[in-house]
């Protein structure tokens, strides 16, 4: 490590809370468009009743995101973080706007052609997700834990916000013609605005915050090349004072980083296998008919999102933060008792039990994810933290792909399942 850089930022360094707010907004933007797609799934089920939109969208989205992040994680040390993240948010903005254009062009009618174009736009969301998520997790991993926690909390907040907006729009337009479509259009317009806001914040605000400049200079002093464009955007052109001594910048290879953190990687994989095998497809298609009617699935999704958000903020309370690696593994494995619990509750239980199980699923997903993502980078140099962050995102998306695929098993035995 270059002289003059300590393990922690000076206490009087300005911009920490501003950076936390920006990271939270960036986290919202990284998932808001996709969560909007999931939350307005009731509209797409109305337009495409025979095509399982929620399951198909996730089956398209996640494998593309996984394939993209695997390529980017392999090449992360040679890719400008700034260009990568801005490209992702710009792609989110354009793709979300195209959903509005598509719906206006087709006037909300179904058809296989409309569905194929819709699935193509969903694929672009997967590409944007991997570009943004891996880049930001890697970038924030080399900074203080509060920033990555704020980003992860923002990701959870995206789900909570979309659920609130969906419930409001459904209630507001319930008695009007094309109520679902009107609500969906409002959603997509808000999503487009949020993604554009993220482009502006990351391009012009975030790189100029003192705490961000400090950690990026520190990473550059440890041999990171991915932060050079960000430092230039902050007005730092002369990096001659940073260390170029290779003897001081010996870094672990990706394989070594993965072996040292294999438990964290596998735990993240298992978390998202379980979560995505249940959410959202099971909640839309396997929870039966209840007195709440078509509000039921929306309430379940909202419940998951709110408890997921709560779980992501819980580690801010020190005694609630799990840091013991064995305890984390036990907690992750214990969650798998939820599988039979969901099965029997869907078959024999009432809505109260289902809401409780969904709450547990959301709470544990958010809490365990943030605990792992904040403790994993500890003790590594900046470039190693960036590489590790990208690797962990690979396992998150890998778990999501497997979970989505396993989610189709819930349809076995159902009439008109396929």
Curated annotation (Swiss-Prot):
Keywords: Cell membrane, Membrane, Transmembrane, Transmembrane helix, Transport. Expressed in leaves and at lowe levels in stems and flowers. The chain crosses the membrane at residues 20-40, 54-74, 85-105, 108-128, 147-169, 186-206, 264-284, 291-311, 326-346, 353-373, 392-412. One of its GO terms (molecular function) is nucleoside transmembrane transporter activity. It is found in: Cell membrane. It holds the Pfam family Nucleoside_tran. It is a multi-pass membrane protein. This is Equilibrative nucleotide transporter 4. The lineage of its organism: Eukaryota, Viridiplantae, Streptophyta, Embryophyta, Tracheophyta.
């Amino acid at each position: 490590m270059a002289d003059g850089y300590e393990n922690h930022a000076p206490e009087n360094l300005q911009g920490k809370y501003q950076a936390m707010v920006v990271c939270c907004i960036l986290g919202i933007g990284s998932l808001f468009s996709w969560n909007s797609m999931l939350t307005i799934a009731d509209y797409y089920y109305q337009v495409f009743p025979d095509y399982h939109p929620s399951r198909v969208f996730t089956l398209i989205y996640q494998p593309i995101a996984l394939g993209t992040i695997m390529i980017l994680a392999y090449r992360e040390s040679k890719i400008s973080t700034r260009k990568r993240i801005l490209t992702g948010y710009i792609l989110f903005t354009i793709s979300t706007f195209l959903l509005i254009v598509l719906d206006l062009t087709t006037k909300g009618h179904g058809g296989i052609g409309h569905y194929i174009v819709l699935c193509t736009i969903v694929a672009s969301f997967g590409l944007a997700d991997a570009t943004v998520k891996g880049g930001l997790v890697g970038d924030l991993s080399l900074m203080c834990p509060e920033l990555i926690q704020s980003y992860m909390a923002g990701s959870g907040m995206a789900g909570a916000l979309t659920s609130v907006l969906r419930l409001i729009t459904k209630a507001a337009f319930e008695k009007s013609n094309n109520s679902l479509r009107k609500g969906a259009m409002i959603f997509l317009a808000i999503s487009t605005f949020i993604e554009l806001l993220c482009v502006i914040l990351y391009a012009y605000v975030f790189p100029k915050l003192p705490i961000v400049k400090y950690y990026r200079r520190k990473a550059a002093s440890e041999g990171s090349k991915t932060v050079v464009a960000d430092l230039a955007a902050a007005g730092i052109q002369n990096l001659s004072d940073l260390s170029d001594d290779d003897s001081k910048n010996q870094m672990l290879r990706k394989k070594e980083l993965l072996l040292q953190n294999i438990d964290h990687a596998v735990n993240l994989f298992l978390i998202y296998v379980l979560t995505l095998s249940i959410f959202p497809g099971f909640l839309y298609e396997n929870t039966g008919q209840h007195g709440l009617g078509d509000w039921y699935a929306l309430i379940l999704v909202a419940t998951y999102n709110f408890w997921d958000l709560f779980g992501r903020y819980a580690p801010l309370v020190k005694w609630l933060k799990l840091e013991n690696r064995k305890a984390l593994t036990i907690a992750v494995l214990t969650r798998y008792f939820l599988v039979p619990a969901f099965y029997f509750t869907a078959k024999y239980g009432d809505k109260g039990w289902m809401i409780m199980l969904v709450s547990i699923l959301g709470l544990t997903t958010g809490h365990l994810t943030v605990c792992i993502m904040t403790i994993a980078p500890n003790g590594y140099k900046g470039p190693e933290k960036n590489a590790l962050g990208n690797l962990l995102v690979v396992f998150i998306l890998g778990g999501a792909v497997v979970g989505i695929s396993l989610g189709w098993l819930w349809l076995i035995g159902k009439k008109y399942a396929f």
